[in-house]
Design a protein with these regions (language model features):
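ALDH superfamily catalytic-core signature
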Residues: 82, 90-235
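Rossmann-like NAD(P) dinucleotide-binding subdomain of oxidoreductase/dehydrogenase enzymes
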Residues: 1-126
Length: 240
């Protein structure tokens, strides 16, 4: 039958291929609803599918700025028998409730708050390498990024020093700039969320080791930031 594939902006091609490929292999047709922030990749995929000989109507794409309205159409249409969604927990809950009305199958890959844990007996260099990879991939905008780093007391200061040295050495620039390590956030809302998390943490006692402000590279750039003294009362301890 028909599969509705609702995909996020942070990996606009990979998420489509992961959802569409198994659906096609199972003999289903697909309606892709890409993020309103990155619709062009989805349209390009559909165009390439047509060029490759995919029959008309097998892969379809619906774009638009009113994501809730499009979601309601997909979840209420009885011809759609499965919904697959990658995105926020809040939206996932809404789609789950809506899909229940017609008892659709549903697959949800939702947000989280992943910890990166460093114990006293850890290999310091390996721990720093791992933290850099886990935290700053795609400017930290992935669902599997380390949202918080928990470091045992005995290695804490050494880790902070080594990690901060690596963070401050990163080049913040447009991804097309040679040697760029960290690019922009997806939009103004994304930048504002980072600012709010940092401000909330500082107001509740956290300390800035480096960063903590927007970056001169542009309005959507935020300086790579290291905070210490973070506790569970702060928003960044529980929000993605």
């Amino acid at each position: 039958s028909v599969v509705a594939a609702i995909t996020p902006w942070n990996f606009p091609l990979a998420m489509i291929t992961r959802k569409v490929s198994p659906a096609l292999a199972a003999g289903c047709t697909v309606v892709i609803k890409p993020s309103e922030d990155t619709p062009l990749t989805a349209l390009a995929v559909c165009e390439l599918a047509c060029q490759a000989g995919m029959p008309a109507g097998v892969i379809n794409c619906v774009t638009g700025m009113d994501a809730p309205a499009i979601g309601r159409v997909l979840t209420s249409d009885t011809r759609v028998r499965k919904v697959t969604f990658t995105g926020s927990t809040q939206v996932g809950k809404i789609l789950y409730r809506q899909s229940a009305e017609s008892v659709k199958k549903i697959s949800l890959e939702l947000g989280g708050n992943a910890p990166f844990i460093v114990f006293d007996d850890a290999d310091l260099n390996a721990a720093v390498d791992g933290a850099m990879l886990c935290k700053f991939r795609n400017a930290g905008q992935t669902c599997v990024c380390a949202n918080r780093i928990l470091v045992q007391r005995g290695i804490h200061d050494q880790f902070v020093e080594a990690f901060t040295a690596r963070v401050t050495a990163m080049k913040v620039a447009d991804g097309r700039t040679e040697g760029s390590d960290v690019g922009p956030l997806i939009n103004a809302d994304g930048r504002a969320k980072v600012e709010e998390h940092v401000e909330d943490a500082l107001a509740k006692g956290a300390k800035v080791v480096c960063g903590g402000h927007t970056h001169e590279a542009g309005p959507l750039f935020y300086s790579p930031t290291v905070l210490v003294g973070v506790n569970t009362e702060m928003r960044m301890a529980s929000e993605e």
